[in-house]
Amino acid sequence: MRTITESESTPKADGFFMPAEFAPQDRVWMGWPHRTDTWAHGAKPAQKQYAAIARAISEFTPVYMCANQVDYANCKAVFENDENVTVIEMTTDDAWFRDTAATYVINVKGEKRANHWHFNAYGGL
């Protein structure tokens, strides 16, 4: 893997583009809710809903669920019978991966590139 800095190039300049929402996906990445300062009731209701969403998606596409170290064992247990959900231990700030994780762009050859959006918590960082 090679890191390309913004000073070297941009995805658009290199012929990469955001695939359509209906385009086939290799997998879906999700983050396990854990922040008790933003999720009510110790994040348990949110975890239940995220599990339901992951299971629905996994009927069609593999899901990679990222859980922090403290919640990893619990998350792994939740999905122990779900063969199309892979739980990965990863430090995350929040479960909202649209803001905090990479998104992927493609080119006409099918190559992929991950974008880092430099998210700053809506000015909070």
Where are the language model's segments positioned?
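The feature marks the mature, well-folded catalytic cores of soluble enzymes
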Residues: 1-125
